[in-house]
Amino acid sequence: MGELPIAPVDRLIRKAGAERVSEQAAKVLAEYLEEYAIEVAKKAVEFARHAGRKTVKVEDIKLAIKS
């Protein structure tokens, strides 16, 4: 884990209205976002394989998010 950079996550929290963000808060959110993204990606891969494809397409990602 820990592949997402902290700075963009910090900016996301600030976009949500925070004036200041602790490094630990940004790290925790980054970890959660990474875990969520991996789960979405795994589902998308399953959908692509079920469709007989090796390539994950936008529709696979959208379907994975909805499921």
Swiss-Prot record:
Domain of life: Archaea
Classification via CDD domains: HFD_archaea_histone-like (cd22909)
Stretch forming the signal peptide: none
Keywords of the record: Chromosome, Cytoplasm, DNA-binding
Pfam families for this protein: CBFD_NFYB_HMF (PF00808)
A GO CC annotation given for this chain: chromosome
Major location (coarse): cytoplasm
Subcellular location: Cytoplasm; Chromosome
Cited function: Binds and compact DNA (95 to 150 base pairs) to form nucleosome-like structures that contain positive DNA supercoils. Increases the resistance of DNA to thermal denaturation (in vitro).
Family to which this protein belongs: Belongs to the archaeal histone HMF family.
Name of the featured protein: Archaeal histone A
Organism for this UniProt entry: Pyrococcus furiosus (strain ATCC 43587 / DSM 3638 / JCM 8422 / Vc1)
Lineage summary: Archaea, Methanobacteriati, Methanobacteriota, Thermococci, Thermococcales
